[in-house]
Amino acid sequence: MSVNGNLRSLIDMLEAAQDGHMIKIALRSFAHSCGYDRFAYLQKDGTQVRTFHSYPGPWESIYLGSDYFNIDPVLAEAKRRRDVFFWTADAWPARGSSPLRRFRDEAISHGIRCGVTIPVEGSYGSAMMLTFASPERKVDISGVLDPKKAVQLLMMVHYQLKIIAAKTVLNPKQMLSPREMLCLVWASKGKTASVTANLTGINARTVQHYLDKARAKLDAESVPQLVAIAKDRGLV
């Protein structure tokens, strides 16, 4: 089947998806059919970043923890143009030990070397994009993707994730305690465990303990991912 044939099938699969797992399976299948290893949906609204992806867990922690969205060349290019585009980390300008050089090297080490990105301008100045990435030097389908279908795909992912988030109901074991919620709220505001301890009067180790319990309940591998999940579920 052609790339656009696979794209049409993907849109149908997304419309039938009942949960995030089904969305992830559909996107991963399409990525592999086009020669890519991973996918990433990203929504940036001011300083807030929300993601849904198949990238390695450690990469998300590094990306969000280091505020790499402020220097990410793919994000920068997506703001300048509104069409599907190909990118490669090998073309990013980077010298010495600059943050951009570190970003490029870490991206490549996590299997993100080239890709194709579908960008769309959202409401109130927000931006959304869907990327398919590969560890290879060049895997480019940007020239054969139907632009209208590509945008339709991105919007389908966006709204399906919103619908699923709205339907998500935490079971009793996932309910956060008042102290866990308190520490989570401060974490969502960018406060470290030590700063939260000073603000709340709770011991710093205890703050970390509450965050660890919240991570376990929401199946998050890191505090940045915990905050992202909590925002998606409307908890903070």
Curated annotation (Swiss-Prot):
Keyword Hydrolase: no
Keyword Ribosomal protein in record: no
InterPro entries: Sig_transdc_resp-reg_C-effctor, TF_LuxR_autoind-bd_dom, TF_LuxR_autoind-bd_dom_sf, Tscrpt_reg_LuxR_C, WH-like_DNA-bd_sf
One GO process term, biological-process aspect: regulation of DNA-templated transcription
Domain HTH luxR-type: 169-234
GO molecular function, a single term: DNA binding
Pfam families, alphabetized: Autoind_bind, GerE
Keywords from the UniProt entry: Activator, Conjugation, DNA-binding, Plasmid, Quorum sensing, Transcription, Transcription regulation
PROSITE patterns: HTH_LUXR_2
Residue ranges flagged as DNA-binding region: 193-212
CDD domains: LuxR_C_like
Primary role: Positive regulation of conjugal transfer. TraR activates target genes in the presence of AAI and also activates traR and traI themselves.
Membership in a protein family: Belongs to the autoinducer-regulated transcriptional regulatory protein family.
Protein name per UniProt: Probable transcriptional activator protein TraR
Organism of derivation: Sinorhizobium fredii (strain NBRC 101917 / NGR234)
Gene (name only): traR
